[in-house]
Amino acid sequence: MFKFLLLIAFLCPPALFANEFCHILSNEANNRGVRFDNTDNVYKVGGKGRLHFYSAPNEKCIEKDVFVVPGNELYAYVEYGEYYSVMYVSDDGDQVDGWVKKDRLVETKYGIAPDYDTQK
C-alpha cells in the first residue's frame, strides 16, 4: 500500500498539491479575515504595471494570466495579511474573483452599498 501511495505522489504533478494548498488557504483566509463594510470597499489600482491575482493570499498561489492594470476598480471584501479578497468587473460584465496585494490599491472613499449613517 505504501508503494502505491508513493507512486501516486510521484506521478501527481506538484501543481495538484499547490492547488489544494491554495484552495484550503483561501477558505481559511475568508473565514478568519477582516470583512469590509460595503459602504467603503471600492478601490482603484495604483502604481505601475500589472497587479496579478492570486487564488489565495500567498505568493505560491499567483494566477500569472489574470491581472488588472492601474486605474481599474476593484471591490474589496476581506483583508487577510498583505492581501485583499476582491472582485473585478470588466467593461463587458465579466467578473474575476481572487486575492491581490493590498499595497497597490488606492481608497476611493465609496462603496457598492449606500451609507445610511451619512443620510441622517
Each model region followed by its residue ranges:
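SH3/SH3-like (including bacterial SH3b) beta-barrel domains
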Residues: 55-70, 76-78
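Short loop/turn positions at the edges of beta-strands in beta-sheet-rich folds
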Residues: 78-80, 92
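Sec-dependent N-terminal signal peptides
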Residues: 4-13
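Boundary regions of SH3-family modules and the immediately adjacent low-complexity/disordered segments
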Residues: 19-41, 63, 87-120
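Sec/Tat signal peptide C-region and signal peptidase I cleavage site
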Residues: 14-18
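Core beta-strand residues in small-molecule sensory/regulatory alpha/beta domains
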Residues: 48, 52-56
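Short aromatic-glycine-enriched beta-strand elements
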Residues: 81-85
